[in-house]
UniProtKB/Swiss-Prot annotation:
Origin organism lineage: Eukaryota, Fungi, Dikarya, Ascomycota, Pezizomycotina
InterPro entries, A to Z: Cupin_8, JmjC_dom, Kelch-typ_b-propeller, Ppm1/Ppm2/Tcmp, SAM-dependent_MTases_sf
Any matching Pfam family: Cupin_8
Gene: ppm2
Protein name, UniProt field: tRNA wybutosine-synthesizing protein 4
Presence of keyword Endoplasmic reticulum: no
Organism in which the protein naturally occurs: Emericella nidulans (strain FGSC A4 / ATCC 38163 / CBS 112.46 / NRRL 194 / M139)
Gene3D superfamilies: 6.10.140.1470, Cupin, Kelch-type beta propeller, Vaccinia Virus protein VP39
Length: 1068
């Protein structure tokens, strides 16, 4: 039974080990602590999986005191990791029990794998002893947890706890815990041979993402030593690898993440591929080694039975398939053995390391992929492409930076004005969605929007039709669906207009569909299509996310998609649509899978999920998506299908006998930033050019990657220029304009005529000093976050910047000629309300001279490259300074969730009182600074206008004598920062700052302390109010307007009553 939840997220250090904290840790100890810290995040994620997917009893709860429910992607990824390790151990234990078995978990962390297996199947474990091995420090903590967990000791039976100085910390009949650094192999070997292992035994080594944190030499030593510990040894290692090189967007994001954590991956560089990993083991004394990606294992019915895969969807709705595949394709499970004659399955090189360039016909030298990444670009994925006319297209809805969006990003090639409101869906009418389709059905650009979803459990049934540039609701689908596929077809003699054929998809309850429907522009709505297959073959399996394309008006092809069992289907069909004599619709399908396999080299990279298909004069261009068993390789990202040959086979009822598949890839000479063609859209902008837009993915827990810019595929011989660029984001936002138009003219005039007169307050010196603390662990800082009170963290290591960043050093390092934008104030107090300052562009050297001479100037750095789009980032904007500044390890949550890190340099000038929605830490580097802070509860008394975040009050109106404004009903707090201090400012605490002497230099790091709820869209400064407040203000406008039909006194009466009710609710 699990203990009650505690405030801490993961285990705190044992008391016996806390004394070690007072000593200054060595470099190796710091490195070990960073590696052990990765275990904390891992077990929290595994606990999330356990809560949802595992039956009672639960075991991670004894090590994770405060559970968190992770996102479905994280849950499924960790479920697969856990299943891979558990299944590997089960297979080992099922082998003939002619000798004792030992499972040695190298770098076990707090993973309770032995307890899970012993509890689930005691008889299977009867001949097995589990041995957990990790750092001494970690195993002391694990021992302390077991002492307190009666449920765990009852499973082990006859548990003995060793003294802290002993290598064997815990011993029972089937479980041993050993504290030993894996780099100390002499000690580990001695302990295992003398105290744990008998002379004859079978040993299975486990290493789940543990050896990769060691330097390569030390990790290789472990692999080699393990092969000699027993004459009957096996090794199962689960780690990251580069299936398509380190430049793949997922790989690059993953590596950057671990680098930021201070726990970089090492072995991956020495052994990047599966074949390299197999060689690593065979050269270290292992007789056989076989590696497979987790994505490959996911599709293996023997390793993950189909019934088990499908059961996961009944527990938690899931639709992050592309992102799951990317994760699973970058992790491998390798099984090695010292037994002679061990048989492995097909080598890794044959299943996952061979790129299509060695298998399929390539035409990469015939095409160019031209990026345009220099101009602003939208960020959305899983939207739908909307044709907008000549040289104009849009991406409608989909997933934006933080949530679903209902508007349209518009792209064009010229600077001509466009009537976006007429051509693109209105966010006022059509709700936000993703995984929907928009299909043109006429030469005039008329199109049909179909279905989609909000969440995977909420499919949409509506349709919308654009005719003559007007969008109107259409006939609802017979059944709501998303991830369906759609294409234009034309039946009858009128070729200028047509119909839309849709197939497959998924419903709200998770049912995968196999139905064909036809929508016709004749007012009749949807018609079902009867399916007939040639040669009495079975009909295609139900699927979603498939590729459906027309070759001409009534013939086309279908392939790929994911079936009901959660794997990508590897079939290929051609189809012919026709009308029977009675007017009914019929679809004739031919299974071309067998013939295509026989003639098409590289067929394994053709089955796709989430790919796009565009028709060109060259053939059908297939781009992106995911494929079975491995990641889509660089030279297989874009494929070309011979549509002429396909059409000839369909019309003549013949099987395929000549190759139709060739690869284009990302261009043989391509050297730019690689796009991630997932969740993207594509469009044939001419007969031989295809434009790729949008896309990106959540790269597991490592961060989000967005494909930047526009990408145009064209033949090599063309003199093409990619000048497609984003016109504007969120083109459909008329709500504010309409609201403004509805304000009476008199009200506008009255508001404009008001003159701001600052109120004079009495003075006071009574302030509450902010507490000073030292923070030595992440747990201590987490407690500070939970307390939500400002503190000054002193004696922290923020790098050599506190000594180095003199005026001369900064000018020389940043560059005297570097252009910066500064606030130049008219007085010593800047006011955001009266704007008594101006923005000036000048060189950094000039600014530093002037500010050190007493100039009333203030620099708050902004993004150097895209100041209107990206938040400030010290490392990116001032790379020459980045190595001088760092946050202490205890504040790693700030680093992991950082939003921005502006550099602040100020002279004798005071910033206005304001609040920030995000939490932040202000690191004082040079000079001293005085800040006055007010708790969020004081905001009604601080003259902060509705919808604004800045106050109109000058708190330092009597700064000369150290007094501040005496504002009734407020509780001012004071922070006096000196060099090296870190001030933690919780969200919504209003604050203002003034230097107390010479020039002040500081770095602010804003970070997200909420998992959701921030404002939608761009937030460069991190101070936009939360989404609920912004929406609430809009709702308030509607509420006030609803009383417009009443006499003013009655409206006021009821509005005040509502205000009282709202205040009562807020104060509960």
């Amino acid at each position: 039974m699990c203990p009650p939840e505690q405030p801490a997220k993961a285990m705190a250090p044992s008391k016996s080990n806390q004394a070690a904290k007072s000593a200054v840790p060595t470099k190796e100890e710091k490195s070990a602590d960073l590696v052990m810290a990765t275990n904390n995040s891992s077990i929290v994620s595994k606990r999330s999986v356990e809560m949802l997917y595992y039956p009672e009893p639960h075991f991670f709860c004894h090590f994770v005191k405060k559970p968190q429910r992770r996102a479905p992607l994280i849950n499924r990824g960790y479920w697969l990791r856990m299943h891979a390790m558990e299944e590997s151990v089960r297979r080992f234990m099922r082998e003939s029990p002619d000798k004792p078995k030992f499972v040695l978990n190298l770098g076990c962390g707090f993973d309770p794998l032995p307890f899970i297996l012993l509890s689930a199947d005691r008889s299977l474990c009867s001949q097995t002893t589990f041995v957990d091995i990790d750092y001494e420090k970690l195993m002391l903590n694990k021992k302390a947890a077991l002492r307190e967990a009666g449920a765990l000791t009852q499973i082990l039976e006859d548990v003995e706890f060793g003294p802290d100085e002993s290598a064997v910390q815990i011993r029972s009949g089937q479980y041993v815990a050993v504290g030993c650094d894996l780099k100390n192999l002499d000690k580990l070997d001695r302990v295992l041979r003398a105290e744990v292992l008998p002379a004859e035994c079978a040993v299975l080594f486990l290493a789940e993402v543990s050896l990769t944190y060691m330097d390569v030499k030390s990790a290789n030593a472990v692999v080699s030593w393990a092969s000699r510990l027993s004459n009957d040894a096996q090794f199962c290692i689960l780690e990251q690898y580069f299936p398509d090189g380190p430049s793949h967007p997922f790989a690059a994001t993953m590596m950057e993440h671990f680098g930021k954590l201070g726990a970089p991956l090492h072995s991956i560089h020495e052994f990047p591929s599966l074949s390299d990993q197999e060689r690593r083991f065979t050269e270290a004394g292992w007789t056989h080694a076989h590696a497979r990606s987790l994505w490959d294992l996911w599709s293996d019915d023997e390793f993950v039975p189909a019934v088990l895969r499908t059961s996961l969807d009944s527990i938690e709705s899931f639709d992050e398939w592309e992102e799951f595949a990317l994760f699973a394709s970058h992790y491998f499970l390798l099984h090695a053995s010292t037994r002679p004659g061990t048989k492995g399955s097909k080598s890794a090189a044959a299943t996952a390391d061979v790129g299509p360039s060695r298998q399929a016909v390539t035409r990469s030298n015939e095409f160019r992929l031209i990026p345009n990444t220099s101009l602003p670009t939208g960020q959305r994925r899983f939207g739908a492409l909307v044709p907008g006319g000549e040289a104009v297209i849009g991406i409608h809805s989909g997933w934006g930076r933080q949530t679903r969006v209902a508007d349209t990003d518009v792209y064009k090639t010229s600077k001509d004005n466009i009537d976006s409101h007429a051509r693109f869906p209105s966010s006022n009418d059509i709700s936000a969605r993703l995984c929907h389709t928009i299909t043109a059905f006429s030469d005039d650009g008329d199109c049909l929007l179909v279905g989609g979803r909000t969440s995977p459990a909420s499919a949409l049934q509506d349709t919308w039709v654009r005719k003559n540039n007007v969008w109107q609701a259409g006939s609802s689908l017979p059944l709501a669906r998303f991830r369906h596929c759609a294409t234009r077809v034309t039946l009858g003699s009128d070729r200028s207009s047509g119909s839309v054929l849709i197939y497959g998809g998924k419903t709200s309850d998770g049912t995968t569909l196999d139905t064909w429907l036809l929508w016709n522009d004749n007012g009749e709505g949807w018609s079902s299509v009867t399916v007939r297959t040639m040669n009495d073959a079975p009909a295609p399996k139900a699927r979603f996310g498939a590729c459906l394309a027309s070759i001409d008006s009534t013939n086309g092809l279908l392939f790929g998609g994911i079936g009901p069992d959660g794997t990508i289907l590897e079939d290929f069909w051609t189809w012919k649509l026709y009308e029977e004599a009675d007017g009914s619709l019929c679809m004739e399908l031919t299974d071309q899978t067998g013939s295509l396999r026989n003639i098409a080299l590289g067929f394994d990279i053709l089955p796709r999920f989430g790919a796009t298909v565009s028709s060109t004069a060259q053939g059908l261009v297939v781009s992106g998506g995911i494929i079975p068993r491995r990641v889509v390789p660089f030279d297989g990202e874009i494929l070309l299908l011979d549509s002429a040959t396909l059409l000839d086979c369909i019309k003549n009822g013949l099987p395929l006998t000549t190759p139709i598949l060739s690869t284009i890839g990302l261009d043989a000479g391509f050297t730019g930033p690689r796009p991630l063609l997932v969740g993207h859209v594509s469009h044939a902008i001419s007969t031989d050019q295809v434009l790729l837009l949008g896309g990106g993915a959540v790269c597991f827990s490592f961060g989000t990657f967005w494909t930047r810019g526009t990408w145009m595929l064209c033949p090599v011989g063309e003199r093409a220029v990619n000048d497609w660029a984003l016109v504007c984001e969120n083109v459909e936002k008329p709500t504010k304009a309409k609201a403004a138009a509805q304000i009476p003219a008199k009200t506008k005039k009255q508001k404009a005529s008001k003159k701001y007169k600052p109120e004079k307050y009495k003075s006071t010196t009574k302030v509450t000093p902010i507490r000073r603390v030292t923070v030595e662990s992440a747990d201590e800082f987490q407690q500070i976050l939970e307390d939500a009170q400002p503190v000054i963290i002193e004696s922290a290591d923020i790098g050599p910047c506190t000594e180095l960043w003199t005026k001369e050093y900064l000018v020389n390092t940043v560059g005297s000629d570097r252009k910066v934008i500064v606030h130049a104030a008219e007085t010593e107090t800047m006011s955001f309300r009266t704007k008594n300052f101006k923005y000036e562009s000048k060189t950094f050297g000039t600014f530093m001279d002037e500010v050190h001479a007493g100039g009333r100037q203030y620099l708050r750095s902004i993004s150097e490259k895209q100041p209107a789009k990206l938040p400030a980032n010290l490392a990116a904007d001032f790379p020459s300074l980045s190595s001088d500044f760092r946050l202490p390890e205890a504040l790693k949550t700030v680093v992991e969730n950082a939003h921005s890190s502006p550099l602040r340099i100020s002279g004798p000038v005071t910033l206005w009182l304001h609040y920030d929605v995000m939490a932040n830490v202000l690191c004082q580097i040079q000079g001293e600074k005085r800040l006055i802070l007010y708790p969020p509860s004081d905001v009604p008394h601080l003259d902060v206008p509705a919808g604004a975040s800045s106050s109109n009050i000058n708190v330092f109106q009597n700064r000369a004598d150290g007094a501040i404004a005496l504002i009734p009903h407020t509780s001012p707090h004071e922070a006096r920062l000196k060099r090296g201090d870190i001030l933690f400012i919780p969200p919504l605490w209003l604050h203002t700052a003034a230097p107390t002497g010479k020039v002040s230099v500081a770095v602010n790091v804003f970070f997200r302390n909420l998992s959701q709820g921030y404002a939608l869209g761009r937030d460069v400064y991190g101070n936009r109010d939360v989404q609920a407040y912004e929406k609430g203000r809009k709702d308030l406008e509607k509420l006030v307007k609803s009383f417009s039909g009443l006499p003013p006194d009655m409206a006021r009466f009821y509005l005040l009553r509502l205000a009282d009710e709202l205040q009562e609710t807020a104060e509960q």
